[in-house]
Regions:
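Conserved RNA-binding domains used in RNP assembly and mRNA/RNA metabolism
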Residues: 2-89
Length: 89
């Protein structure tokens, strides 16, 4: 089977974003609550869309002839994305 030489028309990116953390446990020592914080997260994928409200990436793709299919799509509220780093392809 011959490999297609289709060039992906999307840039590879690393998304740095903030996520909530929650805990269902009870705290007797409130200093533990004072130290409770959100999480910093990173995802790598291809930038599908960036608007003032959302950023959408995907991390899997396939070509069937010239038809592109994508998978593993993630959509982030723009307010939680703190940095977009464009990776070398």
């Amino acid at each position: 089977m011959k490999k297609q030489n289709n060039k992906l028309p999307y840039k590879k990116v690393r998304i740095i974003w903030q996520d909530i953390c929650s805990s269902s446990q009870w705290y007797d020592d409130l200093t533990d609550v004072d130290e409770f914080n959100f999480s910093w997260c990173e995802d790598i994928g291809y930038l599908y869309e960036k608007t003032s409200k959302k950023i959408t990436i995907f991390s899997s793709y396939s070509y069937d002839g010239n038809k592109l299919s994508i998978g593993n799509v993630s959509c982030y509220p723009a307010c939680v994305v703190k940095k977009i780093i464009y990776e070398k392809q």
